């Protein structure tokens, strides 16, 4: 799978997670506290932000599978069903 396509899939996952988070009126801080209760809030927030936005000249950090599962569950999404929705947004010939 081309790297560009992997990046697009990850960005779509983050878009759906953010969409659900906002629909629930959950802030980034709320999500950070839920995912990383043992970390100071600024550090927890930064861990999420690195997945969402570019940091300086670097692209957003790649999301690993565990993070994907934690993020989707934290906003009330079912990981496998959400992945199915994400993959339906991409042409099979590109995958």
Regions found by a protein language model. Give the residues of each.
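Short, charged recognition helix plus adjacent turn
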Residues: 2-7, 73, 80-95
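A short, Lys/Arg-rich alpha-helix, primarily the initiator
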Residues: 1-34
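Short, basic-rich loop-to-helix N-cap that marks the start of a DNA-contacting helix
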Residues: 55-73
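Residue-level signal for the short linker/turn that defines the boundary of a DNA-recognition helix
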Residues: 15, 25-26, 43, 63-66
């Amino acid at each position: 799978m081309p790297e560009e396509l992997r990046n697009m899939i990850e960005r779509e996952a983050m878009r759906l997670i953010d969409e659900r988070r906002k629909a629930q009126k959950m802030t980034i801080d709320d999500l950070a506290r839920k995912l990383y209760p043992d970390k100071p809030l600024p550090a927890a927030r930064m861990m999420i932000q690195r997945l969402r936005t570019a940091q300086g000249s670097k692209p957003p950090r790649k999301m690993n599978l565990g993070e994907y599962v934690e993020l989707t569950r934290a906003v009330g999404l079912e990981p496998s069903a959400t992945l199915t929705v994400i993959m339906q947004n991409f042409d099979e010939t590109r995958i």
